[in-house]
Amino acid sequence: MRSYLLNQFLFSIIILKIIMVPSVLLADNNPINTDILEIKTLGKKWLELYRSSNIEKFMDLYTEDALVALNGKPALKGKEAIQAYFASRIGKKNVDMRLDYEKISIYQNTAIVVAKFYLDYPFEERIETVGGRSLIVYKKSDLGKWLIDVDIDQKTPDAN
């Protein structure tokens, strides 16, 4: 009888663990959920700083040796090259960007994001929209801040 009660007790503990683990993973204070929220917020911050023309703050979003590869353009390697490219392009308040996140994976201090992007900009008398897919790799700095390490944006037929 004692063995039976012990088995029932252990079985109950196992069942409780099975039930509790998913709720712990979904909890609002779960570090992964917090990181995902921070990363999604960075997409909005990028657009805000792009519109602001504050190139120094804009560049604070990138790692020192970041790589940016834009559709049909040579890769930009390092902050200096990225800044040189964006310096004359940012500050356009009438540009809008939307991200449709398809996948966000976090592995310790690295986050990988795949998203469809839509960039709206004025062209002559109308608004043009360019769509594509982004692969963005974020690295967490020593200060705990997520920074863009790799940003690859390409036009894709399913994002128009």
Residue ranges of model-derived segments:
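Bacterial N-terminal signal peptides that target proteins for export
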Residues: M1-S12
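Short, low-complexity N-terminal intrinsically disordered segments enriched in polar/charged residues
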Residues: I14-L61, N160
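Hydrophobic pocket/interface hotspot
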Residues: W46, F58-M59, A66, G78, ...
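A short gly/proline-enriched turn/hairpin at secondary-structure junctions
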Residues: L67-K77, S88-N94
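Short, solvent-exposed loop/turn segments at secondary-structure boundaries
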Residues: N71-K73, E124-I127
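Solvent-exposed loop/turn segments at secondary-structure junctions
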Residues: K73-A75, L119-D120, Q154-P157
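Surface-exposed, charged secondary-structure patches
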Residues: A87-E124
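Short beta-strand edge/turn micro-motifs at domain boundaries
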Residues: G131-A159
